[in-house]
Amino acid sequence: MQDAAAVRTGKTMAVLKKTELVKARKLWEEVFEEDTAKFLDYYETYVADHNQIFAEEEAGDVVSMVQLNPYRVHMGEAEADSYYIVAVATRESCRHQGRMRRLLAEALQQMYQEKIPFTFLMPASESIYLPFDFVTVYRQSLFTCGVVIPGSNDNCWHCIPCRWEQLKELAEWSNVFLQNHSEISTVRTEDYYKRIWKEQESMNGQILLFYEGSQMKGYCFTGYEGSGEAWEIAVEADNPEEQTGSEPRAASDSQALANRRAVEALTRWFGGQDQLPMRICGFLPESYIDGIPLSEMTYRPMTMVRIVNLEAFVSHMRAKKPVQFVLYIKDPIIPENCGVFCFELGRECSSL
């Protein structure tokens, strides 16, 4: 992996020194005006030092770029390398010239050579990435709350800012939680949360932990830039078999109640900071919030993914029972993925 930025000038590839990455920041500031200098300082220090930046340059200025941030991901019980694509940007005067397509194709080809199973991104618009065979896999729920929502004294949750020395415990808890609720998730480590800690600080926020009494029930990330916001709200539901009256509670109802308690705790926390109204987003997919009508919720495409190296991706697939089938694959960006393939999937291993 390169530790600097790859720059395309005409047909020539060059490698920028890290001290020259200020060129990429200049374009970032032009295109993403909503990002603060404080956030970009964080990004340069804790992210850009180990990512890859594909760019096109004119007259010494970066005019188009695609950045790849490396991540380890859980794929079932195994782990794999992946990249999060971020800061896809082109100077306004240089748009509609095929620059983004060239850079994305270049980045995808390099990831293919690295045997990356898949890559992912947060789209500004789905329509931008559909032609590159990205598909949306997660739509984030969000709503705005302007008042403190009271909770029951019997099961009231409260928020406590995470301490630096708790980050290892948080990593262990969140890995278990995410693997219980998803086949694919980013690997959480103490170092991962140290970086997240710095990111939240750059957005005037922090990592909050949810507690019921002395028991930790989950976490979320927060920020404040004119209004409060909380996201990635990961909270553990009570036992699905617990009773409500004479009927057993469904798992989805149990999760909805946990989400409700988290919302109550968040409104009390932000209300105490005089930061209401606040935006709350990012619960578990397909879960809802007890007592909050669906009509008050909106949804936005949050995560799009694309298979990069088909063989590597299939090697991580598993089937409850052995299965074999043939597919014709057409990939407009990565020709190595094109052809007729026999898929052989099993409980322990899979292959093409």
Where are these regions (language model features)?
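Short hydrophobic/aromatic beta-strand element in the GNAT-like acyltransferase core
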Residues: N51-A55, M65, A87, G205-L209, ...
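Conserved GNAT acetyl-CoA-binding A-motif
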Residues: L104, Q110-P123, G272-E286
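Acidic, aliphatic-rich amphipathic alpha-helical segments
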Residues: R260-E348
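Amide-forming acyltransferase catalytic core, primarily the GNAT-like/NAT-type
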Residues: Q140-Q273, M304, A312-V326
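Conserved active-site alpha-helix within GNAT-family acetyltransferase domains
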Residues: Q113-P117, P123-S141, P285-M302
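Basic, Lys/Arg-rich alpha-helical nucleic-acid-recognition elements, primarily the DNA-binding modules
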Residues: R8-T9, A48-N51, M65-R72, G76-G98, ...
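Short amphipathic alpha-helix that is part of the acyltransferase structural core
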Residues: Q2-P70, E77-Y84, G151-D191, G226-G228
